[in-house]
């Protein structure tokens, strides 16, 4: 029984109770959101963990981080360190995107050491194994692809990015679109090559009901991958992207009817003046299910600083209804992130999420911001550290300058808080 089917029966599960407690809402609010598909709770029935999060309407914007091996860097211990950093810095979920030597071992390690929601992209492993077995990923059979999905579900993955919304109608729109960047999704490119080589429909689209049955058995959340997402601001909201979103909406309806929790993966590169429109289209076409975005990157000209461009776009998107932000690190478009990149990526994306969450007056983020402001006036460093998004950094700065009044701009003798306290009695 999935969380969604339980909710539709009027049952409030233990996971719904936990989400309600964390979010400061009623369990009934969470149950109703899950029943409608507006909230998902990534929690595979075969995986035990303490940290539960809800993603969707009326809840705080959540943050996802990425890790995983590759053929260029196959260091499982480094990926374990990255995963620990992700969790320590406050990520709500992670995705293991491994394509290195032993993908199974890497995934099992990630599931074992983490205590947050775990996601993956099954077509990555299926493609790597097809290269080993058939000499090319286009030799992958449909059964091999679905067997990989089922294996990863049975091992405990809480959510999966699966590129089911790629079909010939989307590729035909792409060919006519005059795009700058064509296909930038790794999973999307694998399946595009498979379709053209085999002259067949995408099996994840054609046999979508088979996919739903696999996911339903373990209550793994379906994240409909954005196989045709724009890879440049110039391509945002082109015909290919919109056609992909239309197909995603059709599949969303079928997932909801089957009682499978579902969210939509979005772009990517979106200029600020198109963020509201992008969000409105997704929510309208996809029945209000949660939107999981990869940024948004607000500009294309800042390699080395894409954690910042992503945070700018992510904050705007969160304000307009995005539910789940995938982090970007300074290494985006440059190479694989190291541990420092991961730390910076989570921190900046958490700032973006908080900027959106604080708009809910009286919510968790608002109350935290208010507590920080009051602590600054009172010069209560302990409370400031407790409410900081990066408490370790703040504490280290305070310890480095123990005699400081806390503000290098004014200094102790001209502190506005002191002036206000003395003459107005308001501090």
Curated annotation (Swiss-Prot):
Source organism of this protein record: Eubacterium limosum
Gene, per the UniProt record: bzaB
Enzyme Commission number(s): 4.1.99.23
UniProt lineage: Bacteria, Bacillati, Bacillota, Clostridia, Eubacteriales
PANTHER family for this protein: PHOSPHOMETHYLPYRIMIDINE SYNTHASE, CHLOROPLASTIC (PTHR30557:SF1), THIAMINE BIOSYNTHESIS PROTEIN THIC (PTHR30557)
Record field: catalytic activity: 5-amino-1-(5-phospho-beta-D-ribosyl)imidazole + AH2 + S-adenosyl-L-methionine = 5-hydroxybenzimidazole + 5'-deoxyadenosine + formate + L-methionine + A + NH4(+) + phosphate + 2 H(+)
Listed Gene3D superfamilies: Radical SAM ThiC family, central domain
Annotated family: Belongs to the ThiC family. 5-hydroxybenzimidazole synthase subfamily.
Single Gene Ontology BP annotation: thiamine biosynthetic process
InterPro entries, per database record: ThiC/Bza_core_dom, ThiC/BzaA/B
Keywords, comma-separated and alphabetical: 4Fe-4S, Cobalamin biosynthesis, Iron, Iron-sulfur, Lyase, Metal-binding, S-adenosyl-L-methionine, Zinc
Keyword Zinc included in the entry's annotation: yes
GO molecular function, one term: metal ion binding
Pfam families according to UniProt: ThiC_Rad_SAM
Enzyme class: lyase
UniProt cofactor(s): [4Fe-4S] cluster
Cofactor detail note: Binds 1 [4Fe-4S] cluster per subunit. The cluster is coordinated with 3 cysteines and an exchangeable S-adenosyl-L-methionine.
Protein's recorded name: 5-hydroxybenzimidazole synthase BzaB
Pathway involvement of the protein, from the record: Cofactor biosynthesis; adenosylcobalamin biosynthesis
Function of the molecule: Together with BzaA, catalyzes the conversion of aminoimidazole ribotide (AIR) to 5-hydroxybenzimidazole (5-HBI) in a radical S-adenosyl-L-methionine (SAM)-dependent reaction. Is thus involved in the anaerobic biosynthesis of dimethylbenzimidazole (DMB), the lower axial ligand of vitamin B12 (cobalamin). Requires BzaA for catalytic activity, as BzaB alone displays no activity.
């Amino acid at each position: 029984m999935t969380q969604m089917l339980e909710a539709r029966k009027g049952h409030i599960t233990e996971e719904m109770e936990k989400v309600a407690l964390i979010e400061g809402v009623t369990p009934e609010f969470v149950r109703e959101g899950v029943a409608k598909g507006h909230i998902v709770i990534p929690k595979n029935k075969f995986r035990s963990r303490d940290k539960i999060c809800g993603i969707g309407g009326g809840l705080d914007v959540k943050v996802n981080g990425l890790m995983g091996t590759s053929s260029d860097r196959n260091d499982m211990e480094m990926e374990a360190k990255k995963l620990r950093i992700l969790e320590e810095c406050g990520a709500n979920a992670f995705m293991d995107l491994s394509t290195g030597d032993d993908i199974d071992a890497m995934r099992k390690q990630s599931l074992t050491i983490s205590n947050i929601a775990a996601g993956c992209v099954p077509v990555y492993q299926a493609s790597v194994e097809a290269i080993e077995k058939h000499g090319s990923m286009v030799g992958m059979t449909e059964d091999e692809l679905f067997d990989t999905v089922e294996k990863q579900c049975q091992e405990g993955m809480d959510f999966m990015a699966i590129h089911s919304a790629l079909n010939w109608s989307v590729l035909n729109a792409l060919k006519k679109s005059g795009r700058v960047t064509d296909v930038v999704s790794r999973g999307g490119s694998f399946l595009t090559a498979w379709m053209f080589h085999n002259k067949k429909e995408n099996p994840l689209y054609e046999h979508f009901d088979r996919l739903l049955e696999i996911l339903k058995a373990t209550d793994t959340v379906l994240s409909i991958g954005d196989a045709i997402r724009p890879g440049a601001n110039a391509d945002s909201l082109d015909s290919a992207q919109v056609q992909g979103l239309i197909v995603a909406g059709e599949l969303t309806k079928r997932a909801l009817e089957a009682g499978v929790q579902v969210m939509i993966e979005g772009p990517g590169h979106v200029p600020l003046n198109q963020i509201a429109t992008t969000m409105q289209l997704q929510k309208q076409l996809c029945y209000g299910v949660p939107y999981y975005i990869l940024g948004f990157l607000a500009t294309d000209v800042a390699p080395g600083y894409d954690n910042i461009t992503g945070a700018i776009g992510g904050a705007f998107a969160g304000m307009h209804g995005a539910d789940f932000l995938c982090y970007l690190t300074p290494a985006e478009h440059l190479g694989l992130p190291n541990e420092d990149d991961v730390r910076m990526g989570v921190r900046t994306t958490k700032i973006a999420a908080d900027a959106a969450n604080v708009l809910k007056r009286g919510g968790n983020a608002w109350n935290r911001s208010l507590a920080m402001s009051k602590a600054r006036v009172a010069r209560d460093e302990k409370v400031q550290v407790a409410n900081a998004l990066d408490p370790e950094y703040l504490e280290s700065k305070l310890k480095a300058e123990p005699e400081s009044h806390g503000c290098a701009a004014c200094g102790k003798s001209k502190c506005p808080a002191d002036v206000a306290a003395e003459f107005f009695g308001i501090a």
